[in-house]
Amino acid sequence: MAVGLLALTVIVDRGQVLIAPVTLALVIGLMFGPLADRIERAGVPAPISAATIVLVFLTLISAVIATIVIPLTAWTERLPVIWARVQSILADWKDLMTTMDSMSASLQNALGQEGNAAEVKVDDGSAVENVAWLAPAIATQIVLFLASLYFFMATRHQLRSSVLGLCFDRRLRWRIAHVFRDVEALVSSYLISITAINIAMGACVAVAMALLGVPSPLLWGMLAGLLNYAIYIGPAIMAVIMLGVGLATGSSTTDYVAPMLAYLAVNMTEAQFVTPHVLGRTLTLNPFIVLLALAFWIWVWGPVGGFVAVPLLLIAAAAIRHVSPANHRRFALEANAEKN
C-alpha cells in the first residue's frame, strides 16, 4: 500500500501539467452541475448550457484577476519600505543586532546604488525570460482546463450512464449511482456555500480596511476571500500579508498591527460561527485530515491544490460511505428489514 501511495504521489506530481487542470475542471463542473441541470430543464441543449457556464465563469475570473493584479503590482513596489520597517523594529532587539547588520548590507546590495544599475537590469531581464518560458505552459493549462470544463459539463450525464452501464451487479450499480449523486451534491453545496461565505468575508475585510484608512481596501477584501478557499493555510498567509500592509502604511505600533488584527477578527468570526452554521454537520471533516490534505495538495499542485483539496476529500468520503465493507453490511440489513 505504501508503494502504491508513493507511486500515486509521483504520478500526481509529474503529471501536474495534465492532471491538475483536468481535476480543477471536474471540481468546478461539479459545482455548476445543479445550475446546468436547471438550464437544461428549461429546454436549452447541454452543449449550449455548458458553453454558457464556461463563458460566465471565464468572465468572472477575468474580472477578479484584473481587479487584483493592477493594484497588487503597485504594492510590490512598497516591499523595500516594508523590509525597512521590519529592520527598524528588529533593530531595537539588542540580541539581533548582528543579524540585522548583515540583512541591512544584503538589502542595500539588493536595492542597488547607482553603480549597481547594470545588475538590476540583468535581474529584470531574467524575470522577463522566465515569464516568456512559463507563458506557453500556463496558456496550455488554461486551454486544457476550459476544454475539460466544457466537455465535462456537456457530457456528464453520458459519462455517468456509461459508468453505470459497466456495473453488471444491481446492488453495485445502485451504490455507484448514489456515489455520483452524493459527490455532486456535497461538492456543489460546499463550493457554493464557501463561495458565498468568502464573498461576505471579503466584503467585511474591505470595509474594515477602509475604516482603518488602509489603501486599496477592495484589493485586500478580494485577496482575503480568495485565500480563504485554502482553509487554515490561506488565512495564515493573509495575516502575514496584512501585517506587511500595516508596516508599509502605519506610523506607530498600533498602526502596524491594526490591519492584521482586524482581518483576524473577521476571519475568526467567520470560522467559528458563520461557516459551522451555514455548512452544518453534514460537511464537517476531521480538521487533522483536512490539514494533511491541504499540505499535500499545495505541495504537489500549489494554489490549485489548495482549492481542490477539500472537494477531493468530500469525493473520497462519499465513495467510502457507499463502497466500504461496513456500509455494505448496513445496506444489506436495511434491504432485509424493508423486505420483512
Where are the regions a protein language model picked out?
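N-terminal hydrophobic signal/anchor transmembrane helix of membrane proteins
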Residues: 1-10, 203, 233-240, 246-254, ...
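Anchoring transmembrane alpha helix of integral membrane proteins
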Residues: 1-70, 145, 165, 314-340
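Alpha-helical transmembrane segments and their immediate interhelical loop/hinge regions
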Residues: 134-247, 253-259
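Juxtamembrane membrane-interface segments in integral membrane proteins
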Residues: 35-42, 48, 63-144, 162
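Generic alpha-helical transmembrane segments of integral inner-membrane proteins
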Residues: 2-7, 11, 23, 51-64, ...
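Short helix-terminus and kink motifs of transmembrane alpha helices
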Residues: 13-21, 29-37, 41-42, 46, ...
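Short amphipathic alpha-helical coupling elements at transmembrane boundaries
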Residues: 37-41, 74-77, 81-88, 92, ...
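Hydrophobic alpha-helical transmembrane segments of membrane transport and translocation systems
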Residues: 256-340
